[in-house]
């Protein structure tokens, strides 16, 4: 009988972690001879990826018949916090019951990690808990207390970058023997080739992508674009994603008459077709771990301009070799590097190094 591996990763809006979960589960299905993977579809959030999950023969465990996902707000800090509380209340007992009844070999925790970690503190399980660091962890007071207690009973903690691994080591919140470096899984080149073929209804643009949050720093990009178009009003920038700062970004675009230069295109299921056609990819994040879209841009051989965000981008991008790096949140340095980045001859050299 195969050992069961459960994935816990509830989300309010699609992010790169969702695809990482699917790819990880698929890897277990494909290469784990004695294991089978299950994604816990807590409130119907993974129905967005139903076709891909079915195609990859990954099993789904549904918690509720009612589609919570359609009704939970995710835009705005207060509303997203309310949604988190709702998820916590409706999730803690069903997850406890699933683990006690089904007794999977492993529970891999990606998002909303506090819920299963609290269960790990309060109860004993036959299941081995694995915490996957998804995004750079801000060790605030609550998280430090929670991790200090919960990680005593954790099986492993996996980190997507060496910088994060060292950061967790230095925190001394978990025994070093339980730490592992594990890079995020990516789809096969065959799949990328197929996805790149899809048509995109835009031409001659730069692309940015991610949740519209403070972390992604898209307002900074909008301010930079305002300066860029003073020299060339035909420049076009697409931002793919949804999130709590959408209203602020739209307001800035409207107030500065940037509607013809900056387009918010919402969440994009297939980012590869957009990356393939883009003049370049721009990452303005304040921090990333690892910065999954940088890897996707590299696969598409799309030139990259990235902030020197820690821990992922600074580890992935080597300045003027496989991309360009600017000082995070520094408009002058961004504009200087964008001018070089915008030079076709410079970009051709970067493409050769991907």
Regions found by a protein language model. Give the residues of each.
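N-terminal strand-loop element at the rim of the active site
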Residues: 7-15, 27-83
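A conserved mid-protein helix/loop that constitutes part of the nucleotide-sugar donor-binding site
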Residues: 18-26, 204-230, 244-250, 292
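Short His-centered aromatic/hydrophobic patch
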Residues: 88-91, 109-115, 133
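Short beta-strand->alpha-helix junction loop in the catalytic core
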Residues: 136-137, 163-164, 182-192, 211, ...
């Amino acid at each position: 009988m195969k050992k069961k591996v459960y994935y816990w990763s509830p989300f309010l809006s699609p992010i790169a972690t969702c695809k990482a979960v699917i790819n990880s589960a698929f890897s277990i299905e494909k290469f784990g001879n004695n294991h089978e993977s299950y994604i816990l579809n807590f409130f119907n959030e993974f129905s967005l990826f139903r076709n891909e999950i079915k195609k990859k023969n990954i099993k789904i465990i549904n918690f509720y018949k009612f589609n919570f996902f359609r009704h939970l707000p995710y835009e705005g800090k207060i509303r997203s916090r309310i949604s988190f509380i709702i998820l916590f209340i409706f999730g803690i007992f069903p997850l406890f019951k699933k683990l006690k009844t089904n007794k999977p070999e492993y529970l891999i925790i990606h998002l909303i990690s506090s819920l299963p970690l609290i269960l790990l503190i309060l109860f004993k399980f036959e299941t081995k808990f694995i915490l996957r660091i998804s995004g750079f962890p801000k060790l605030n007071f609550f998280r430090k207390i929670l991790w200090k207690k919960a990680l005593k009973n954790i099986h492993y903690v996996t980190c997507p970058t060496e910088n994060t691994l060292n950061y967790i080591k230095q925190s001394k919140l978990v025994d070093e023997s339980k730490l592992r470096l594990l890079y995020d899984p990516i789809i096969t080149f065959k799949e990328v080739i197929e996805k790149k073929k899809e048509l995109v209804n835009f031409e001659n643009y730069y692309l940015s992508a991610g949740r519209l949050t403070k972390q992604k720093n898209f307002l900074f990009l909008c301010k930079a674009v305002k300066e860029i178009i003073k020299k060339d009003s035909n420049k076009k920038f697409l931002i793919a994603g949804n999130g709590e700062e959408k209203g602020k970004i739209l307001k800035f675009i409207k107030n500065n008459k940037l509607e013809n230069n900056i387009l918010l295109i919402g969440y994009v299921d297939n980012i590869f077709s957009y990356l393939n056609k883009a003049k370049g990819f721009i990452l303005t994040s304040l921090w990333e771990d690892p910065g999954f879209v940088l890897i996707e841009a590299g696969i598409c051989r799309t030139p990259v301009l990235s902030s020197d965000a820690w821990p992922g981008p600074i580890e992935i991008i080597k300045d003027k070799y496989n991309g360009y790096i600017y000082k995070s949140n520094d408009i002058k340095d961004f504009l200087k590097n964008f001018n070089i980045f915008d030079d076709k001859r410079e970009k051709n050299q970067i493409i050769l190094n991907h």
